[in-house]
């Protein structure tokens, strides 16, 4: 059986009833896979490449991953937090070095690393126009690292921006955690989260 391991942040992590309706990509991926492929999701809310590694979250992946498995690597949202030294990474130095650590962990075990650029934040300046992307430096750094290390890359950043442009500002509120007050026990005060 092939396993897809995920390393990432809240946009990927498995959520339960306590955080519903938040849903990570890795949480629902198995719905689109054949039965002989399983998902093992190690993504954790709020993590950057730095904090994920510093907290030894890569270790259990390394211990379990085997030849023919995949390691999907999706970070950027929290790496860009300059005021948080436990998470911040410079996009063109630390971030790229950390991405290489994930690649090496997979390849050392005969597995396949795959980079996935961060999902774009919902950043409209009006109903039809998106602001300049918030993750551009990290997207560029991931693309450069993918090229340098010959790692396949899925450009979720560009795809998500294109879909947001087509849908418009109001419709995309449904795709993000824009929650009305009094509806969800996990967010009784409501929530306007564009991540």
Regions found by a protein language model. Name each.
Residues 48-56:
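Structural motif
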Residues 14, 49, 161:
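Active-site environment of divalent metal-dependent phosphoester hydrolases
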Residues 57-195:
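Alpha-helical cap/lid subdomain in secreted, periplasmic
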């Amino acid at each position: 059986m092939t396993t897809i391991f995920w390393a990432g942040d809240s946009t990927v992590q498995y959520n339960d009833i306590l955080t519903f309706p938040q849903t990570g990509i890795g949480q629902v991926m198995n719905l689109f896979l054949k039965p002989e492929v399983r998902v093992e999701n190690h993504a954790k809310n709020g993590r950057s490449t730095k904090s994920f590694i510093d907290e030894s979250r890569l270790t259990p992946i390394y211990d379990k991953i085997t030849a023919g498995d995949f390691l999907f690597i999706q970070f950027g949202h929290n790496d860009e937090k300059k005021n948080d030294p436990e998470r911040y990474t410079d996009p063109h130095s630390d971030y790229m070095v950390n991405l290489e650590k994930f690649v090496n962990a997979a390849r050392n075990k005969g597995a396949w690393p795959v980079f996935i650029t961060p999902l774009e934040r919902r950043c409209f300046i009006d109903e039809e126009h998106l602001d300049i992307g918030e993750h551009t430096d990290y997207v560029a750094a991931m693309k450069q690292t993918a090229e340098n290390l010959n790692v396949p890359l899925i450009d979720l950043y560009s795809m998500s921006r294109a879909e947001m442009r087509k849908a418009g500002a109001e419709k995309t509120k449904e795709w993000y955690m824009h929650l009305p007050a009094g509806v969800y026990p996990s967010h009784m005060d409501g929530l306007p989260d564009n991540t």
